[in-house]
From Swiss-Prot:
Residues 1-23 have a biased composition (Polar residues). Signal peptide: none annotated. This is Palmitoyltransferase ERF2. The ERF2-ERF4 complex is a palmitoyltransferase specific for Ras proteins. One of its GO terms (molecular function) is protein-cysteine S-palmitoyltransferase activity. Its EC number is 2.3.1.225. The chain crosses the membrane at residues 88-108, 122-142, 230-250, 263-283. It is an enzyme of class 2 (transferase). GO terms for biological process: protein targeting to membrane. Residues 185-235 form the DHHC domain.
Length: 367
């Protein structure tokens, strides 16, 4: 195998033309303009960073360059992110999270706290799990899922658009589990040999470490760095719905009739309907983690067109299985977050090849 890892400061000579173009672009981007024109634009770009020219800035952060080679939109100086050109269903989920707690705070909390005996612990637990749910929602949908850097393994070729044939092969490595090798594939978009369990997300246009799935409802991938937050979001949303429903039931019983507590009845109906989707999804992921599988691996292993109704079982050749259901759950649910490989809030160095978008290569090497 001809594997050649290239550091950002020392790219291969075959891409010298692209490097010159990028360097000249960086030089033009660093030209200073009058401060009276630049401060407002810098503030706006700090608040929202999208894939657009930034010629008014004298220094860049990595997240500003990352927006050019991925589909990410960054907020608050690279602290939060989402994916561009999607349906933005996460906004709907956010409204569905905030609306019931606002109604509960305005119409229910005061009455329960003052007039219903024994309701105070229920109110406290309701707010606690809602806060946990909201924090998990932000941590899952607006943080780094485990984005891998680009252009780490570039081929030694004289043609800019071709790769050697072995780069299209699958490498098998031994594992502790018999007859279950670890498979590695090369990503022709990101130009890297992907680590085990990593996969390229077409929506985010990035390779994600320990890729589970891309969640349309959260508008982000679920990977190694936010998997625990995703599971916490599912369980806390179920628990917050249970306690909200309990509080409203106490209010309704104390009021005596639905007409005396219409908001309580509305919230009870809302919780009774909305609790099922996160509950079923939480149970589904419990079974997946118990068998040491990600959603991506499970869907690839299922032969049926209806994977929802397919029985979740231990895969025949899983190099990551431990033999214990509890240990499998612990390893996936409590796995280390890992490193931020791109250091998105650090200063951007001109010519850093992790932030290049190279052409898609041809299928065969030059002969």
């Amino acid at each position: 195998m001809r594997l050649h890892s290239r550091q950002a400061s020392n790219p291969h000579r075959q891409y010298s033309a692209a490097q010159s173009l990028h360097s000249s672009s960086d030089d033009s981007e660093h030209k200073e303009i009058p401060s009276t024109m630049g401060w407002a634009k810098r503030l706006m770009r700090w608040m929202v960073t999208v894939d657009q020219p930034h010629t008014f800035e004298t220094s860049l952060k990595n997240y500003q360059s990352l927006a050019h080679v991925t589909n990410y939109i960054f907020f608050c100086g690279g602290r939060l992110r989402t994916v561009a050109k999607t349906k933005y269903l996460s906004v709907l989920v956010l409204v569905m999270l905030i609306a019931p707690i606002v109604l509960f705070s305005v119409f229910e909390t005061g009455y329960l706290w003052k007039h219903v005996a024994g309701a105070k612990p229920c109110v406290v637990l309701c707010y606690y799990f809602w806060t946990l749910c909201f924090a998990s929602f932000i941590s899952t949908g607006a943080t780094d899922p485990g984005t891998l850097p680009r252009n780490i393994h570039l081929a030694q070729l004289q043609d800019d658009y071709k790769l050697p044939l072995e780069y299209y092969s699958i490498i098998t490595l031994p594992s502790p589990v018999a007859n279950a090798p670890v498979r590695l594939k090369y990503c022709t978009t990101c130009r890297i040999w992907r680590p085990p369990r990593a996969s390229h997300c077409a929506v985010c246009d990035s390779c994600i470490l320990s890729f589970d799935h891309h969640c349309d409802w959260l508008n982000n991938c679920i990977g190694q760095r936010n998997h625990r937050y995703f599971l916490a979001f599912l369980f806390s949303s179920v628990l917050s719905s249970i306690w909200l429903l309990t509080c409203c039931a106490l209010k309704l019983r104390h009021a005596g009739s639905p007409s005396a507590a219409p908001v309580s009845l509305l919230l009870i109906c809302y919780c009774a309907v909305s609790i099922w989707y996160p509950l079923l999804l939480a149970i589904y992921h419990l079974f997946l983690t118990g068998t040491q599988q990600t959603t991506h691996e499970y869907l690839k292993a299922v032969d049926s067109r209806n994977p929802i109704f397919h029985k979740v079982t231990h895969p025949e050749r899983n190099p990551f299985v431990t033999g214990s259901c509890a240990r499998n759950m612990l390893l996936l649910m409590c796995q280390p977050r890992g490193y931020d490989f791109l250091h998105t809030r650090s200063e951007h160095q001109a010519g850093d090849w992790r932030f290049f978008r190279l052409p898609i290569p041809h299928s065969f090497e030059k002969v």
